[in-house]
């Protein structure tokens, strides 16, 4: 939970994590009053939280059954909040594996598509090159947040350059995985120099319109991140 979070954010995180963690089991019924007692939040806050959780497919509301917790196959598993709750809960290993598989399927293809777009005269790698260079600069600095911001910008730009709007919508999913890797898995460890070089190679391959090399280098980035876990 983020420091300084509002009462709404705290209650949402608490209930979302409870559903993901199985404290509130699929099929179980509850009430607004029960959620108020669990979170200590006001009725208006809890009502808003239940609307959000309903939108995420995590619970349903009905006059006779009250609030009912829904199973995981109903959840919006691509929402970054759901991803974060799963990464921070007992299901974290499964969520990491699913993120890894998603990145393997999506990012090399996005890098290849970006190279094709650039080769065909659509788009510019200026922002991508800047993000790759910022990663190198931030790796030497004291502020780890700057490195994460540059890393997120790099991967988001690859998706954007692909020319595929649907791939672009996966930006928040990829970013949540990068955030977890930077803040939880890597912790205080300095960024790997070889990985930094690979990011620059991806940018160079995209700029040169080399689909195969862009995909291969992006695949290597993901595989190295997986092996480091």
Q: Over which residues does each language-model region extend?
A:
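Short linear motifs at protein or domain termini
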Residues: 1-105, 112, 116
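Hydrophobic side-chain positions on well-ordered alpha-helices
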Residues: 18, 137-141, 159-161, 205
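Short loop-to-helix capping motifs
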Residues: 32, 142, 163-165, 209-210
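Amphipathic alpha-helix face/heptad-repeat signature
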Residues: 95-102, 124, 131, 147-150, ...
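Hydrophobic, amphipathic alpha-helical faces that serve as interaction scaffolds
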Residues: 102-120, 149-189
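Exposed, interaction-prone assembly regions rather than primary DNA-binding/catalytic cores
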Residues: 107-139, 143
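C-terminal all-alpha effector/ligand-binding and dimerization domain
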Residues: 129-136, 155, 168-229
């Amino acid at each position: 939970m983020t420091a300084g979070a509002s009462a709404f954010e705290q209650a949402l995180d608490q209930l979302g994590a409870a559903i993901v963690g199985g404290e509130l089991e699929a099929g179980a019924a509850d009430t607004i009053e029960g959620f108020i007692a669990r979170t200590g939040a006001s009725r208006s806050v809890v009502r808003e939280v239940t609307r959000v959780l309903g939108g995420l497919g995590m619970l349903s509301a009905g006059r006779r059954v009250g609030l009912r917790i829904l199973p995981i196959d109903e959840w919006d598993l691509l929402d970054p909040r759901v991803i974060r709750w799963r990464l921070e809960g007992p299901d974290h290993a499964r969520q990491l594996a699913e993120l890894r598989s998603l990145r393997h399927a999506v990012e090399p293809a996005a890098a290849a598509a970006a190279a094709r777009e650039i080769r065909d005269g659509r788009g510019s790698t200026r922002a991508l090159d800047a993000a790759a260079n910022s990663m190198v600069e931030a790796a030497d600095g004291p502020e780890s947040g700057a490195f994460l911001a540059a890393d997120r910008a790099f991967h988001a730009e690859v998706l954007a350059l692909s020319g595929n709007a649907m791939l672009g919508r996966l930006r928040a999913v990829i970013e949540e995985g990068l955030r977890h890797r930077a803040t939880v898995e890597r912790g205080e460890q300095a960024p790997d120099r070889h990985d930094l070089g690979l990011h620059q190679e991806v940018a160079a391959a995209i700029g040169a319109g080399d689909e195969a090399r862009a995909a291969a280098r992006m695949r290597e980035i993901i595989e190295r991140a997986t092996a480091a876990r």
